[in-house]
């Protein structure tokens, strides 16, 4: 720990994945890191009210798993010992995208199939083993305290739920907002006299339904998952991943209002309608383990904080405060971990400069779409052939999603 930070305190608003990982990064710098969470947190691996997406499909791609392993050494082996599935995401997962199957072959890109409650609960448990981490649950942050003369956030006003005491001030040298989509950061910034960031909204009309099933060895030819992507003009998709406890978690849905039904027969019929049959072949006969769980997400929203020339000192927003993305296709926690890997090296710096660093790789995805290569007038026959070549896809995934090459 740096000597000049030893006597300083950081406060993190929110104990979801973004908040837990931000706290872990800050623990290497600050003498005390306090995580403030409004929910009562479960002792085990249970879904909770503040994470409604936690009942749906989650997992870690290779880069996300690597960063988590760096933050918490031995994490992967610990999760596998408890039933999670680690494996080569190219060799052991069936991918169907834009009319082609990705050829399964070893890639040395190892992901982790794990439920969101188990992932979050395990990260929280490991985090609390650090001596300078403190958790304050069932405690709501009313607002950060702000010194207008210095242009600096100096702490947070908190209210304990169910307690008789009034609001109290928790002083801090650095405050991180990781409170999720419902954060009041835009309103706080406006009240402090800072400009609102430009917002970029893309309506997607996404809706999906999830159910868990009993997993048998003969399912999916022994593979650990299947992803059937939406390929326009067919906007329907399906995701099936192995989970701890010999379970499958299956999510089917669609974009632009083409949502999966929430009754048993409708759910199975929707799975039958997907472009490939692997998910349907499992759900039509497997034993359901829970009710059908719907989720809707209307739009992706990005706030361009990196464009602001002024921002309060001692204040930072991570994860969904910057980019709100739908989470059912596994990339959400990986983007969070990728951002934390960059954030870990620069607490205390200016927010706008840090945002420019963290978001420098957030170019529109269509620029890197292999299907786009096939559609371009200027594409050559060689380019079109390579558009579904696994080697080309490996390069795309390594460079723009997983941030590493195999080997």
Predicted feature locations:
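N-terminal Rossmann-like FAD-binding beta1-loop-alpha1 element of flavoenzymes
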Residues: 3-36
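Residues in the short beta-alpha loop(s) of Rossmann-like NAD(P)-binding domains
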Residues: 39
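Short beta-strand to alpha-helix junction loop
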Residues: 59-60, 106-125, 178, 184, ...
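FAD/FMN-dependent oxidoreductases across multiple families
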Residues: 113, 208, 258-369
